[in-house]
């Protein structure tokens, strides 16, 4: 059985609301930290989300 090459990560809002998304990413194809614009329901607008470690 092959091991999964994907790692669970947490995308945390830069707006300071404490909102976060969880997702997975392939460490071999994307070794750098992920930054993506997503909707923050607490701020009620699109903001940048940065990757942090999932505890």
Curated annotation (Swiss-Prot):
Compositionally biased intervals (Basic and acidic residues): 1-11
Domain of life per record: Bacteria
Region (Disordered): 1-29
InterPro entries: Ribosomal_bL33, Ribosomal_bL33_CS, Ribosomal_bL33_sf, Ribosomal_zn-bd
Entry keywords, A to Z: Ribonucleoprotein, Ribosomal protein
Biased composition (Polar residues): 14-24
One Gene Ontology cellular component annotation held by this UniProt entry: cytosolic large ribosomal subunit
PROSITE patterns, A to Z: RIBOSOMAL_L33
GO biological process: translation
Gene Ontology MF terms in the entry: structural constituent of ribosome
Cysteine pairs bridged by disulfides in the record: none
Protein family (similarity comment): Belongs to the bacterial ribosomal protein bL33 family.
NCBIfam families in alphabetical order: PRK00595.1 (NF001860), rpmG_bact (TIGR01023)
Protein's name in the database: Large ribosomal subunit protein bL33
Organism: Thiobacillus denitrificans (strain ATCC 25259 / T1)
Gene (name only): rpmG
């Amino acid at each position: 059985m092959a091991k999964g090459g994907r790692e669970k990560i947490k995308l945390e809002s830069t707006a300071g609301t404490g909102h976060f998304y969880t997702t997975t990413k392939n460490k071999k194809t994307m070794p750098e930290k992920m930054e993506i614009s997503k909707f923050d329901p607490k701020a009620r607008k699109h903001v940048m989300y940065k990757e942090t470690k999932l505890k």
